[in-house]
UniProtKB/Swiss-Prot annotation:
Its cofactor is Mg(2+). InterPro entries: RuBisCO, RuBisCo_large_chain_AS, RuBisCO_lsu_C, RuBisCO_lsu_C_sf, RuBisCO_lsu_fd_N, RuBisCO_lsu_N_sf, RuBisCO_lsuI. The disulfide bond which can form in the large chain dimeric partners within the hexadecamer appears to be associated with oxidative stress and protein turnover. Binds 1 Mg(2+) ion per subunit. It is an enzyme of class 4 (lyase). This is Ribulose bisphosphate carboxylase large chain. The gene is rbcL. One of its GO terms (cellular component) is chloroplast.
């Protein structure tokens, strides 16, 4: 069975048992009345069952309802069908004040019907020939308004300075000021020029998201013909069907696939209604993507440490044990499905590098947008500062130093021989985003 954990807030006067049963019925075989065609099938075989209800500590009117769904309710290899069944209709139920899907347990038999990520962590490292450290990346800013040539210039400067990747922002598609084909051409030129000068493999996440699947394929095919290593997709606004199709194309044609989670906070930000990001992360791993955003813990975007590391493990590891302290409601076995690199992004700069290296480990992508392009000396020095800070942190960690305790000292030591890093430390030394996370256990 597929198991689901729902946070249920019933209307006043509705018992939690009734609310849990209603969720199970509405998201499987039930409707609001008895129908004569019920007698033409075996409802016992197909109906969802609410098998356990528990109170939420500190919340008098909220309960966790556990629901089991028989596997035969779901089409094989279709995230679209799975989510349509489980969360498609029930969230508007009048008997509930609010409903949130906290977690899913996907059984190995169903996991095996999915291709998953086009390549996975190890294949990506082999393609890029980069091992033993997180990857570095920058989103080109301003995200909108640059011409294709100026955009390509910024890409070149960042890659030449030492970053592994640069990236289109999520809303860069094909606007009047910069059509997609022009952007692809100038970015490809920047990639190959920086590769020739540095001797390292470089990439730029070319956003293939489009208004139709046919147009999306056209852009992905052009990227492959240019010989670039990676494309990108906005998987929630683009849709799971389009995302799975693009993931299959990327595996067949040797392209890495970066996933942007634009719109996720609309779904997952509210604590008592919607869907937790760990569910979206599991769905993405099944649908297909080699990278996805996972918060930062230390930056400007939402993310509490234990919860964030919980779904980072769900993205990367083959087997994840149930751990309620990290928000993981079920043990998850991914069998042979490849892992996904977690991307840390949002309001981070060189002073955060020790914490990010310690929190996310090697199998991650650290994304410094303003933290690269905001350097007072320009884009390339900003990239140099980030690369020097990362190399210093990785070396210190490998020497057995504690990044959590000695992080500031490690960055200070490195800045003595890197004027670019020293300038970055000076300009961002006062920047803090000290807000409490909304999403807590």
């Amino acid at each position: 069975d597929i198991l689901a954990a729902f946070r249920v807030t019933p209307q006043p006067g509705v018992p939690p048992e009734e609310a849990g049963a209603a969720v199970a019925a509405e998201s499987s075989t039930g409707t609001w009345t008895t129908v004569w065609t019920d007698g033409l099938t075996s409802l016992d075989r197909y109906k969802g069952r609410c098998y356990h209800i528990e109170x939420v500590p500190g919340e008098e009117d909220q309960f966790i309802a556990y629901v089991a769904y028989p596997l035969d309710l779901f089409e094989e290899g279709s995230v679209t069908n799975m989510l349509t069944s489980i969360v498609g209709n029930v969230f508007g139920f009048k008997a509930l004040r609010a409903l949130r899907l906290e977690d899913l347990r996907i059984p190995p038999a169903y996991v095996k019907t999915f291709q998953g990520p086009p390549h996975g962590i190890q294949v990506e490292r082999d393609k890029l020939n980069k091992y033993g450290r997180p990857l570095l990346r920058c989103t080109i800013k301003p995200k909108l308004g640059l011409s294709a040539k100026n955009y390509g210039r910024a890409v070149y400067e960042c890659l030449r300075g030492g970053l592994d990747f640069t990236k289109d922002d999520e809303n860069v598609n094909s606007q009047p000021f910069m059509r997609w084909r022009d952007r692809f051409l100038f970015c490809a030129e920047a990639i190959f020029k920086s590769q020739a000068e540095t001797g390292e493999i470089k990439g730029h996440y070319l956003n293939a998201t489009a208004g139709t699947c046919e147009e999306m394929y056209k852009r992905a095919i052009f990227a492959r013909e240019l010989g670039v290593p990676i494309v990108m997709h906005d998987y929630l606004t683009g849709g799971f069907t389009a995302n799975t199709s693009l993931a299959h194309y990327c595996r067949d044609n040797g392209l890495l696939l970066h996933i942007h989670x634009x719109m996720h906070a609309v779904i997952d930000r509210q604590k008592n209604h919607g869907m937790h990001f760990r569910v979206l992360a599991k769905a993405l791993r099944m649908s297909g993507g080699d990278h996805i955003y996972a918060g930062t813990v230390v930056g400007k975007l939402e993310g509490e440490r234990d919860i964030t590391l919980g779904f980072v493990d769900l993205l990367r590891d083959d087997f994840v044990e149930k751990d309620r302290s990290r928000g993981i409601y079920f043990t998850q076995d991914w069998v042979s499905l490849p892992g996904v690199l977690a991307v840390a992004s949002g309001g981070i700069h060189v002073x955060h590098m020790p914490a990010l290296t310690e929190i996310f480990g090697d199998d991650s992508v650290l994304q410094f947008g303003g933290g690269t392009l905001g350097h007072p000396w320009g884009n390339a020095p900003g990239a140099v500062a980030n690369r020097v800070a990362l190399e210093a942190c990785v070396q210190a960690r490998n020497e057995g130093r504690d990044l959590a305790v000695e992080g500031n000292e490690i960055i200070r030591e490195a800045s003595k021989w890197s004027p670019e890093l020293a300038a970055a430390c000076e300009v961002w030394k006062e920047i803090r985003f000290n807000f409490k996370a909304v999403d807590t256990l």
